[in-house]
Each structure stands twice: as structure tokens, then as C-alpha cells.
Amino acid sequence: MNARTPDTKSDSYDALLVLSFGGPEGPEEVRPFLENVTRGRGIPPERLDEVGAHYYHFGGVSPLNRLNKEIIANVKAELAARGYDIPVYFGNRNWKPFDNEAAEQMAADGIRNALVFATSAWGGYSGCRQYHEDIQGMRAHLEEIGAPEVTFTKLRQFYDHPRFVRTMAQYVRESFDKLPEDLRDEARLVFTAHSIPLNSKDADGNPIDGSIYSRQVEESSALIAREAGIDDFDVVWQSRSGSPHVPWLEPDIVDHAVELNENNGQKALVVCPVGFISDHMEVIWDLDSELMDEATRRGMVIERVATVGPSDEFATMVVDLIDEMEMKRVIERLGTLPVRGSTVNGEPCVPGCCAPRRRPAASQTNPNADAPVASRS
């Protein structure tokens, strides 16, 4: 199966695949899901138990699949409103419905030239290239079982799309309005996204525009703040794991809140999870549980900004991205950093971009060390 570039695509696509990370939908699914996520990484069982406790706290259910289904329903409605008559499929890397199963169904249904919307706004390995690898895996699976070939064209990164920025800015303003009136003027806006190891940060992008993920997060945050009419803000990180000896992007959101409170007497924060399009586990545990608990102990008030994924405006943006491909429209964007991500059949955006850093097996490092068990989605 030969990969192609977007310049050689056909003029019409016959399906859309929403490709995501996956999450358990019951207690019995938690451990198998985590084993899928960590397969081949040598993660100690006790680390899986620790992360599993986060899911069990919510009944063993991640909200991610439900929220993705909301996105799909909204996208279907927007497609119909614009006169598109194409089916929408759903597949995950790590849990049901699996991406290979979605690819099988697409091939059986006669789909031959599909678009792929990955539920990540960003560049970088976890935010972009890993989805290209998923596409390569789906095509290899179809070839292995003798199914008809399906061509997959991934839609581009959208961290600075006007609809994404405007909707997030609207949600930021609404969060400020929810604060007690006497705290609004002094409240600080803090953007947060999933941390990554510094060696992965340096590998994101190509040799010319490295660290693309962290730079896109910073630019997106600045665009949202400006649209919301806010001059001063912070960009921080969350959900780090792994050995404490491995440096990750900092500061951590909880550490930052504590520092603002202790050093500046900060009493109120508006926290915007810009790195996440939906309220999945990193949002509802790390922010709505851990951060809120620390804030309560300190007498701080925190308003957590809503995520954009379930909104009608987000679905409109997804179909805008489809329009760009179908009609060869000039892309809509507000930022200045490179925007890539759209290739055919899982080809990297440019040779060598966003290369994964090889993780040593747990037995080769600290046998009691944590290891990453989550990815941006």
C-alpha cells in the first residue's frame, strides 16, 4: 500500500473517522484498558493500581467515550446542515470501539477515501504523530486480513482555529463572571495542558521548528487571553508521571496555585484546560479533584473553564476543516507557528518530525518508578 500526499488526493471523501484515545466504561474495563495503554513499556503493576484508583473513583468510567459520541452527534448534524452525505465512524487506540474494528467496518461498507479527525488540537508526538501511526496500523491491519484498501487523510492541527479560540475565550469570560464579584478583578487566569518529558519536548516538530507542542500551547493561550480581553496570564502543565528523576515541563498546576497563594496572597484563579478538548480523566481528576482539594484547604476559589469539545461551535469547526480539504480553501487560523498534521495514510508531516523518544524498560531504571500511562487526547 503506497502512501500519498494531500496534493494527490481525490476531490471527494466518502467518510469521516473520529479517532481518539479511548477510555473504560465500567470497572471491569479499567485494568485491561490500562494494560493496553502501557503495553510494552514495562510499567509495574502497582503503578497501574494507582492510576486505576482514579477511574474507580468515578465508577470505573472515563467520560471520554461519551463526550466523543456527543462530538460525533454534533458533527453529524453540522454535516447534514451543510449538505454532506457521508457516514461518521468512531475508533480508539486503546479501547472499544477500537480503531482496527472501525477500519474493518469502513472497508466492509465500501469506504475507500476517508478523512480522519483526531481529537487533539496539537502537534508533537502524542498530539499528532501517534495518530499517524494509528492510521498506518489500521491500513496494515486491513492488508493483513485481506480487506479492501482504505485511504485515510488526517485533518490538520487546529490549536489556533478562530472558532476554537473564540469559544474558549467565551468560556473564560463566563468563568470570570461566575466568581464572587469581590474576587473578579484580582483573579488570575491560568492555562494548563498535559506535561511531557523535556526530551520529548525537544523532539516535537522538526529540526527547524522543534518544541512545537509546548509553543503551540503557549500561542493558543495567548490568542484566547487576548480574545477574552485579558493581558496577564500563566501557562502551566499537569498530569506528569514517570520517574521523579526525569525532568518534565513545569510548573505543575497544583504547585503553581500553591506558590501564587503563598507568595502573592492569590485568592482566586480561573483555570482553563486549553490542552484538552473534553472533560476526560486528566481534567476531572487532576483539576476537579486534586487541584480543587488543595484550593479548598487554602481557602482559594477556583473556577475551572469548560472544555470546548461538546459545543456546537466545535462541531462547526470540524466541518470547517473538512471544507478546507473538500474545497481546497485557504485555512482559517490566527497564529503564526507551523500548523501541520494533514497527511495521507499516516505519513509523517515532514521527515523525522516529532520522533518518539525510546523509553527504557522499568527493569532498566528504578523498578519502583512511575511511568507515563496517559496521552493527550
Curated annotation (Swiss-Prot):
One of its GO terms (molecular function) is ferrochelatase activity. The keyword rRNA-binding does not apply. Keywords: Cytoplasm, Heme biosynthesis, Iron, Lyase, Metal-binding, Porphyrin biosynthesis. Pathway: Porphyrin-containing compound metabolism; protoheme biosynthesis. GO terms for biological process: heme biosynthetic process. GO terms for cellular component: cytoplasm. Pfam families: Ferrochelatase. Fe(2+) binds at H194, E282. InterPro entries: Ferrochelatase, Ferrochelatase_C, Ferrochelatase_N. It catalyses: Fe-coproporphyrin III + 2 H(+) = coproporphyrin III + Fe(2+). The keyword Ubl conjugation does not apply. Its EC number is 4.99.1.9. Residues 357-377 are annotated as: Disordered. It is found in: Cytoplasm. Fe-coproporphyrin III binds at S62, Y131. It comes from the Bacteria. Its main location: cytoplasm. PANTHER family: FERROCHELATASE, FERROCHELATASE, MITOCHONDRIAL. NCBIfam families: hemH, PRK00035.2-1. Involved in coproporphyrin-dependent heme b biosynthesis. Catalyzes the insertion of ferrous iron into coproporphyrin III to form Fe-coproporphyrin III. Belongs to the ferrochelatase family. This is Coproporphyrin III ferrochelatase. It comes from Corynebacterium efficiens (strain DSM 44549 / YS-314 / AJ 12310 / JCM 11189 / NBRC 100395). The gene is cpfC.
